[in-house]
Amino acid sequence: MYYVALDVGSRTLGIATGDGEFKIASPYCVISFNQYDFRQCLAELKEKTASFFYDFKFVIGMPKNIDQTKSSTTEMVENFIELLKANYKNEVIIYDESYTSIIADQLLIDNQIKAKKRKEKIDKLAAFVILQSFFDDDRYPK
């Protein structure tokens, strides 16, 4: 089974893809859109995924606080998921995204990527971290 991971932000959507059989994730792209305009975002996501020749499931990063309570952005992501489910028939898996942006940023720093370039890459790399973490998590069948 193939998977498409999404890191949802108020202005960007980081996307990673991966193969559950081999448990390998890859950063794919970033969609930029007007703040909170998830309809615009989904239209662009449809264009990006239209060329995929395989069935896939979505893995959506869900932000939570350290104590597992809802964060300030949880509601925004929940609203995005509602729209996604209304526009796609694909299964949606919700996965904890705690620290993914921090991990992604550290990966870029460790690879000596300059700050300006890090900003361009952080969202798709965060989606990659979400998907690779999902693949590495034995609680989820692939």
UniProtKB/Swiss-Prot annotation:
Gene3D superfamilies: YqgF/RNase H-like domain (3.30.420.140). GO terms for cellular component: cytosol. GO terms for biological process: rRNA 5'-end processing. Its EC number is 3.1.-.-. Belongs to the YqgF nuclease family. SUPFAM superfamilies: Ribonuclease H-like (SSF53098). Coiled coil: none annotated. This is Putative pre-16S rRNA nuclease. It is an enzyme of class 3 (hydrolase). It comes from Mycoplasmoides gallisepticum (strain R(low / passage 15 / clone 2)). InterPro entries: RNaseH-like_sf, YqgF, YqgF/RNaseH-like_dom, YqgF/RNaseH-like_dom_sf. Could be a nuclease involved in processing of the 5'-end of pre-16S rRNA. Keywords: Cytoplasm, Hydrolase, Nuclease, Ribosome biogenesis. It is found in: Cytoplasm. It comes from the Bacteria. Signal peptide: none annotated. One of its GO terms (molecular function) is nuclease activity.
